[in-house]
From Swiss-Prot:
Solcar repeats lie at residues 12-115, 129-215, 222-318. This is Mitochondrial thiamine pyrophosphate carrier 1. It comes from Neurospora crassa (strain ATCC 24698 / 74-OR23-1A / CBS 708.71 / DSM 1257 / FGSC 987). SUPFAM superfamilies: Mitochondrial carrier. Mitochondrial transporter that mediates uptake of thiamine pyrophosphate (ThPP) into mitochondria. One of its GO terms (cellular component) is mitochondrial inner membrane. Keywords: Membrane, Mitochondrion, Mitochondrion inner membrane, Repeat, Transmembrane, Transmembrane helix, Transport. It is a multi-pass membrane protein. Belongs to the mitochondrial carrier (TC 2.A.29) family. The gene is tpc-1. InterPro entries: Mit_carrier (IPR002067), Mitochondrial_sb/sol_carrier (IPR018108), Mt_carrier_dom_sf (IPR023395). PROSITE patterns: SOLCAR (PS50920). GO terms for biological process: thiamine pyrophosphate transmembrane transport. It is found in: Mitochondrion inner membrane.
Length: 333
């Protein structure tokens, strides 16, 4: 982007960063929505370690919901039973989530970076290594954005988990039902593993991204896609390492009174917190159970990060230009 700034965290005002983040979140979510729905369906499907076919037999006998076998078969099944719109289930809360999450994340990332640069000034030889600065700022941004927008994340999961028979007919009804049956804490089911997953994930993501971005920008890739490539590589590395906690979060999010009403009717009960849930999954499904849906998650995370970072940088560049053309102080482009 800027000819002077080599790092994402050094560019744009807070308002420009917020607007660019919201724009990136809006576009990214719509593009990757089908893969997100598929990922959630696969993550919520459990298998018995002692009898891998038990889940399928139960589904056939008691109507436990469809058995998904991979990304493409899952897409075909959803299209056949729920239609094209089934791949965009939960898109309204998800769009709200992605827009608000990205806006908060990039704004916090910029603010934490400025704080660290002021607390550890370069001219006094106290400056943190760039990778450490990026990790701290990214981890903080991910934690804050997740905590602020978590109810929307929970709603996104529950709507995506619905089959033909809807548990919640509308977003407003979902909010009312959850409050009436689960209380305020119902909106924050799974927040613990959510934070435990997102903090190292976003720390690693921004650390790798900020390291690769200036190097890839020198390659003059077509369509200025260096930011997209950096986003893909950073996302794959970060997602693989933290995926089990993402799966645990999803399983906990659909607990409560509506647990048996989703497309998977026999979702197990997990009521002992994050550590106990991990132990239960490993005991019942083996270590592989913690990585159920990893392939589609990487297929989703890679393009999502590519679209997000590419769109963010293009949008930020546009907003900086608009700011420079209008009244007030000018910023480098």
């Amino acid at each position: 982007m800027s000819g002077k700034a080599e790092r994402l965290k050094d560019e744009g005002s807070r308002l420009q960063v917020t607007a660019a983040g919201a724009t990136a979140g809006l576009i990214s979510r719509f593009v990757i929505a089908p893969l997100d729905v598929v990922k959630i369906r696969l993550q919520l499907q459990h298998h018995s370690l002692s009898d891998p076919l038990l889940h399928q037999r139960r589904a056939e006998i008691i109507g436990g919901g469809p058995v998904y076998k991979g990304t493409l078969p899952t897409i075909r099944h959803i299209l056949r039973t729920e239609g094209l719109t089934g791949l965009w289930k939960g898109n309204i809360p998800a769009e709200l989530l992605y827009v608000s999450y990205a806006a908060v994340q990039f704004t916090t990332y910029r603010s934490i970076t400025q704080f660290l640069q002021a607390a550890f000034p370069k001219d006094q030889n106290k400056q943190l290594p760039p990778s450490v600065e990026s990790f701290i700022a990214g981890a903080s941004a991910g934690g804050v954005a997740t905590a602020v927008t978590y109810p929307l994340d929970l709603l996104r999961t529950r709507f995506a988990a619905q089959g033909v028979e809807r548990v919640y007919p509308s977003l407003v009804q979902a909010l009312k039902t959850i409050y009436a049956s689960e209380g305020v804490t119902g909106y924050f089911r799974g927040l613990g593993p959510g934070l435990a997953q997102i903090i190292p994930y976003m720390g690693t993501f921004f650390c790798v991204y900020e390291t690769l971005r200036p190097r890839l920008s020198k390659l003059e890739l077509p369509y200025s896609s260096g930011s997209a490539v950096a986003g893909v590589l950073a996302s794959v590395m970060a997602k693989t390492g933290t995926f089990p906690l993402d799966l645990v979060r999803k399983r906990i999010q659909v607990q409560g009174p509506t647990r048996g009403m989703y497309v998977h009717k026999n979702i197990p009960v997990y009521d002992g917190g994050m550590v106990k849930t991990v132990a239960t999954i490993v005991r019942r499904e083996g270590v592989r159970g913690l990585y159920r849906g990893l392939t589609v998650s990487l297929f989703k995370a890679a393009p999502a990060s590519a679209v997000t970072m590419w769109t963010y940088e293009r949008a930020l560049k546009l907003y900086i230009r608009l700011g420079a053309a209008g009244p007030g102080r000018k910023e480098g482009v």
